[in-house]
Amino acid sequence: MNLKNRHFLKLLDFTPEEITAYLDLAAELKAAKKAGREIQRMKGKNIALIFEKTSTRTRCAFEVAARDQGAGVTYLEPSASQIGHKESIKDTARVLGRMYDAIEYRGFGQEVVEELAKYAGVPVFNGLTNEFHPTQMLADALTMREHSGKPLNQTAFAYVGDARYNMGNSLLILGAKLGMDVRIGAPQSLWPSEGIIAAAHAAAKETGAKITLTENAHEAVKNVDFIHTDVWVSMGEPKEVWQERIDLLKDYRVTPELMAASGNPQVKFMHCLPAFHNRETKVGEWIYETFGLNGVEVTEEIFESPASIVFDQAENRMHTIKAVMVAALGD
């Protein structure tokens, strides 16, 4: 199997065997780092990190992973990148491709990262777009594999909340590609697009995955091993949108009751972070004062419980991103 010089844009581009190879490599690299026997396989390589959207986990994961492996990075922050403003995506790709061995892009439309990949001449990695979040999916799959105690194709998980964007889309495709029992619990107006659902069903035909989309949150989580969620509203959206979304999604909040509805005492909670789970941030306090909610998509009780594996998930961003880069660029 050859992952050398491969772009990493979306899971739809990969076979189940290739996705599993990334997970196996990530597990090896993680074990090597923990044991203090990591071998640098990217010495002399340079990677450009284009961030049109800010990030804590993605940036730190790419930077630490690259440095662990002996590579250099250049961080292009949102205010520094001219991409699409003074310089076209096509030209930016060709310039950076002459200077760097790979390019990471985190930003808006999937079409941007696809165009970068078309013209860069070097591997391009998707750090997040509106449509897909493939590096997060490797982290999620590795975390589920570590905590499940059984093969992924015998594992069930649910995503509850707003499923229209990168997390809902990507988790549906991940489950389909890896032969999992994947459920989406959301109001139908917040389901992934018909195109994504069709792609998931097509992948499931090959892998034997089971796909369920339901408006009933309790039905979605019945007998699952993992319950995933994400934020309901993006920062910068008006107060009216927050109120509307909170009203629409209140039954999909991850509470002790929803966890119990799984019927699985070992069920685990997952979240890509950041999460609105208490009043300890300015946003959290504003939400409490405005809507009377202490925590939005998940309660503090669940977030801080032994069932929560969100920080294992966050750590695994780094190990899985390292696997993507080593597979593409490693000696």
Curated annotation (Swiss-Prot):
Protein residues bound to L-ornithine: N166, D230, S234, M235
Major subcellular location class: cytoplasm
Enzyme nomenclature, EC number: 2.1.3.3
Binding residues for carbamoyl phosphate: S55, T56, R57, T58, Q82, R106, H133, P134, T135, Q136, C272, L273, R317
PROSITE patterns xrefs: CARBAMOYLTRANSFERASE (PS00097)
Keyword Amino-acid biosynthesis: yes
UniProt superkingdom: Bacteria
Record GO terms (molecular function): amino acid binding; ornithine carbamoyltransferase activity
Entry's localization field: Cytoplasm
SUPFAM superfamilies: Aspartate/ornithine carbamoyltransferase (SSF53671)
Cellular-component GO terms for this entry: cytoplasm
Pfam family, any one: OTCace_N
Keywords (A to Z) from UniProt: Amino-acid biosynthesis, Arginine biosynthesis, Cytoplasm, Transferase
Pathway participation: Amino-acid biosynthesis; L-arginine biosynthesis; L-arginine from L-ornithine and carbamoyl phosphate: step 1/3
Role, per record: Reversibly catalyzes the transfer of the carbamoyl group from carbamoyl phosphate (CP) to the N(epsilon) atom of ornithine (ORN) to produce L-citrulline.
UniProt record similarity statement: Belongs to the aspartate/ornithine carbamoyltransferase superfamily. OTCase family.
This protein's name: Ornithine carbamoyltransferase
Species of origin: Neisseria meningitidis serogroup B (strain ATCC BAA-335 / MC58)
